[in-house]
Amino acid sequence: MKAVWKGLFTAVALSALPLMSVPASAAGTVTVANATDAGSWDPIDTFTLDWGRVGSNIFDALIQRSNDLKLNPGLALSWTISDDGKRFRFKLRPNVKFQDGEPFDAAAVKFTFDRLLGPDGSKGAQQSNYTAIDHAEVVDDMTVDLILKQTDPVLITKLAGYGAMIVPPAYIKEKGVDYFRTHPVGTGPFKFVDYTPKVSLTLAANPDYWGGAPKLDKLVYRFISEAATQVAELQSGGIDVASLVPISLIDTIKSDAKLDVVSITGPTVNSLRFNVQSGVTKDPLVRKAIIEAVDRDAIIKQIMQGNAKPIASLQSQLSFGYDPGLQRTPYDPAAAKADFAKAGLKPGTPIKISIIGDDQTFREVAQAVAGYLQVVGFAPSLSPSEANTYYTDVIPNGHTGELFEQVWGGWTFDFDNTAYLLYHSGQFWNPYIKDQKLDQMLEAQRAIMDHDKRQAILRDIAKYISDNYLELPLYNSNTVYGINKRVKGLDPAPDDRMRFQNASVE
């Protein structure tokens, strides 16, 4: 076997010595506001950043991504990859236990991937990220192999993701999957205490955590969907961290001496995608007119107040496959009106924009887009939905308007994760696009381990999407947090996870 590591990875397989658990003076509670309640805390069910802010403190994966975006040993101390790229061998971290006392070993890793790739995983949103894996094999108690059906150049990165977080076999077999979803157990720095759906979830410090005991004694998550309510609770002391901060209230938080605003550039991108199967947006000329009609720079400046960057494709500058030379379709209202007429549309043509109802900032963006479209000749309307309904029904079942909001986290920092899941025929997040040429390009890059060749194909994919007007890329949005200054040692990561292992309170 040989070690393979490219791009962000080092030239050899990573390894690390076991970390000693250092006793900490656990004291204090931090209360965090999450916009949504994931409903299930099972890693294979999730797809939301709100889950990650909780789950990343309960569970660990074989690989960990640090805040500088490097991939490091987690529950795996080291790994090697076979010459054909189809066998990944992991040496596991010894003397690790799940929070219920169950030992972590190769059997737990095999159980985790058997679940992920089996019937349980097929019901959730994570399985499609790991379909290159055929099965897991136990070599010995502290060694496990992942056997692939085909090569996957992004697999190591994916193994730092939510779906690959390791779960306890005996606990799940004894309690059942439904119980596990609401009473999660992992190997992470905090352990489950209590969960009241739609209200709150409480975690306590795991004093036996392999990476060192947390400094806090408790984490409380409150589910608050309204951004203005989160900010009001932050000001009153009801919460310590607001994860949903509307741009319009940033100055309000900054004016409070006890609060800080943290704005982080990460992988999150925002767009309006098109229903390309039916309605007026089936016509590429209409889609072109819509894109030409919207002044994205004005939206970034006036609504986002600079907390975003322009994009020409649905990926940030941090993404592998990003093409700095790809140009956006320019803002040109005159051309938009001409294309509107050329497409045979009449003034007052209705067009519906589906959005997530509790996203106050994007609602303002959508209202601005509607204003631009009205100038061209459309009669736009906004159709808001509750977040969980939007993600589990509106998009995957094709119940959107002609345009629909898409927020994408880009958690692998690789355009494959975005492009394959959003544009390949039959994918959960792709209710409309069926394009054989696009499918072929998406499949081709997944079979290539060569860094430069794969990057070229990913850039071709981005250009193809742009040339065919398949979406309206809006911006790469910063993640904005409001944080009480009494919270110390909290360094929010670019991947939007919040890890509280090193946090403390005054």
Where are these regions (language model features)?
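Gly/Pro-rich hinge or "lid" segments in bacterial periplasmic/extracellular proteins
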Residues: 160-214, 218, 228, 334
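Structural transition elements
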Residues: 309-342, 359-364
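N-terminal lobe/hinge region of extracytoplasmic solute-binding protein
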Residues: 33-83, 114, 185, 482
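Ligand/substrate-recognition segments at binding pockets and active sites
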Residues: 32, 197, 341-410, 425-426, ...
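Extracytoplasmic/peripheral linker and loop segments enriched in polar/acidic and small residues
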Residues: 285, 381-390, 417-485, 506
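Surface-exposed binding/hinge segments that line
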Residues: 91, 128-170, 194
